A protein has these predicted regions:
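Blade-loop segments of beta-propeller domains
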Residues: 54-85, 89, 111-115, 294-298
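Conserved blade-ending motifs and adjacent loop-strand segments that build the rim/top face
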Residues: 218-229, 283-303
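Asp-box/WD-like beta-propeller blade repeats and closely related beta-sheet repeat scaffolds
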Residues: 99-129, 135
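Structural signature of eukaryotic scaffold interfaces centered on beta-propeller domains
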Residues: 25-28, 74-80, 123-128, 172-186, ...
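Loop/turn-rich, solvent-exposed surfaces of beta-rich toroidal or solenoidal domains
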Residues: 240-280
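Beta-strand-rich domains and repeat architectures in extracellular enzymes and scaffolds
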Residues: 13-43, 248-265
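Flexible internal linker/loop segments at domain or repeat junctions
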Residues: 209-250
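A short helix->beta-strand "capping" segment at the edge of beta-propeller domains
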Residues: 1-22, 233-239, 286
Length: 333
């Protein structure tokens, strides 16, 4: 679907060993700090100073008390009010904290508010300005828009591929599962498929969700089952050897959205010579450029000011700085 043969090959330089990292899940760069959802030493987040990478802090205690989390799954930055939103998948809540004087702290002084969600949104929840976004299956729609009280006020988005079994909702979600990412001003967002290659761009304007652009060419390769219980149709899905892992994550900057793409089937996962791709789009969905990496990256964070891509390799969880060809200097440890 994209001209990967024309993508530039980029290489990385290790800046921190795996001894410093637990199991990194997701990364954000805010005020020259690299935040990593990374359960380690009783904390949920590892924070690395990108000016001095030897300066590492652990924040966000594990627990159910004030300013604690059980299972962080997403961190969203809002550039309009200079705040961070933390989504706890186990507690089903989003907690907001303000950034004061360029200091990122999770305590009573920086706490702003928190919002709890019910089982109507069983998967990912992302802060979106005064609203929230959720993925899943909502009356055959892919996404839901929620207000500040966590009430669903709109359901939208139709999966462009095979919708057989969509009425089963949670079971069907494996076939059309997506990851979500907003822009820094939280007026636009992108969704990308985990096992299919849907990539769809939306903007929020005049209290309406508007689709800007959509790419799609491949359904999820799953084993689908159809049985009957009396007059009721029952559908289920599961992975097989042909199931292909497509987009792994999205990362937003002020001007662009980056997509990390694998395109590797389960049967090929143990083979050597695997590569991945980083695609760079503007917020209207136009592909600006792409990069090829001769390794598998688990997740990425982009610093466009210093022209660096920070990444964690798979499966060694080694932290790297990946150079783009136009970079003139490395980030030194």
């Amino acid at each position: 679907m994209f001209p990967t043969k024309n993508f530039k090959t980029i290489k990385g330089k290790q800046i921190l060993s795996d001894l410093f990292i637990g199991r990194p899940l997701k990364m954000n760069i805010v005020d020259n700090k690299l935040l990593m959802i990374d359960k380690y030493e009783g904390k949920q987040i590892t924070m690395i100073d990108l000016i001095n990478t030897n300066k590492i802090e652990r924040i966000a205690n594990i627990g159910e008390g004030p300013n604690e989390f059980l299972n962080l799954r997403d961190i969203t930055y809002n550039s309009k009010n200079n705040s961070l939103a933390f989504f706890d998948g186990m507690l089903r809540q989003v907690s907001f904290y303000k950034i004061n004087e360029h200091k990122i702290q999770i305590n009573n002084n920086t706490f702003h508010r928190k919002v709890r969600f019910n089982a109507d949104c069983p998967y990912d929840i992302v802060a979106f300005g005064d609203y929230f976004l959720a993925n899943g299956c909502f009356n055959a729609k892919q996404f839901a828009l929620l207000n500040s009280k966590a009430d669903i006020i709109a359901e939208f988005g139709v999966f462009p591929g095979d919708n057989t079994g969509v009425e089963v909702e949670n079971s069907f979600f494996l076939k059309n599962q997506t990851t979500l990412c907003t822009n820094l001003g939280q007026s636009r967002f992108v969704a990308a498929g985990y096992f299919h290659d849907q990539l769809v761009f939306y903007r929020f304007e005049n209290n309406k969700i508007i689709k800007v652009r959509e790419y799609f060419s491949m359904n999820a390769k799953m084993v689908s089952r159809h049985t009957k219980d009396g007059n009721q149709d029952i559908y289920s899905s599961s992975e097989n050897d042909e199931t292909t892992r497509t987009y792994r994550m999205l990362y937003s900057t002020k001007e662009h959205i980056y997509a990390l793409y694998w395109g590797i089937a389960n049967k090929d996962f143990g083979k050597t010579g695997k590569v991945c791709y980083i695609l760079k789009f503007d917020w209207n969905g136009n592909l600006k450029e792409g990069f090829k990496v001769n390794n598998l990256l688990k997740n990425i964070a982009i610093d466009e000011i210093s022209n660096c891509i920070y990444a964690v390799t798979y499966p060694d969880t080694v932290f790297r700085s990946v150079e783009q060809p136009k970079i003139t200097r490395n980030i030194q440890a």
